[in-house]
Amino acid sequence: MKLLLNTVYKFSAAHRAMLEAVCPGLELVELNNSAVEQLDGTEVDFLVSEQVPRNLEAWGRLHWVQLLSAGSNQLAGHPIQKTTIPVTTASGTHGVPIAQYVSCATLMLAHRMPQVLQYKETQQWPNRLALAGRPLRGQTVGIIGYGSIGRECARQLAAFGLRVLCLKRDPQARQDEGFNAWPGTGDPEGRIPAGWFGPAQLTEFLPQCDYVVVTVPSTPQTEGMLGLAQLALLKRSAHLIVISRGGIVPEPVLAAALRSGLLAGAVIDCYVQEPLNGPHEFFSTPNLIMTPHMSGVFEGFWNLMVDLLAENLRRFLTGAPLLNRVSHRLGY
């Protein structure tokens, strides 16, 4: 059987030994993130890649695709959705580092870092009372999306004394059935949130929040879910952190809300168009911290990814359910 790795990452000798122990005789082929439509997939059984070929008729032996991302919005409208070929994501590998990023972002907003850091630029001692930080203890954070990332955000932010609310597609499903590469983390039993909300309850959920963390995948249901009408429900002192995908908060709406003071501040790590280079209105928007989709980029990712790959390979060969299998119906 042949496994094709089409990414910037490479298998170490230890990685190869791990995979070959699961599947003796497995042929491992490495490419450097090549254009997948130009590849010869006629003899490929397993594909590890961020790109998924559309010309599936030329990949007649393809049995399974493993993505390197936690999300799968790149499959929207893709021909593979009309097949029985399973696609799995890297969900569960990013929880701790992305939650660290969210904790860092929350602290930066609470301590007014976009304004405080101007001190070095102006070289003038500021009015410190005007830049006073806000203690997190007793504040409320609303987490939209309560998968592996949202649950670890809840665990870390609760340690600061924040009251946690969560909003998810099915608030009755409180246990986490997904993969978690970080034992002892997250909220597997769903015990942290003080309140659970469904999508139809945004009008009850948002007014309670001092911070809103967006972790939901990009789907037709989540696209534009936080528009002007929804942001207007927040306190004017509220802050927004978006780490999943662009477009869930329409970019012109977010920029206008920050410029008008409807929203106190935001941290954005994902955009409709990536890579995002200027000109773009975000680059001149006040009280906005921008990062280039870095929250899930961390040292050690590839080792965790290969562990997941080996486990899913074992499951595939034994007929067990694959971890993180994408639902083509739900889009994630």
Region locations from a protein language model:
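N-terminal glycine-/charge-rich "phosphate-binding" loop or analogous flexible N-terminal tail
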Residues: 1-44, 165, 169, 175, ...
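Phosphate-coordination loops involved in phosphoryl transfer and adenosine-cofactor binding
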Residues: 84, 137-140, 237
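Glycine-rich NAD(P)-binding loop of Rossmann-like domains
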Residues: 117-152, 198
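Rossmann-like adenosine-cofactor binding region
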Residues: 171-281
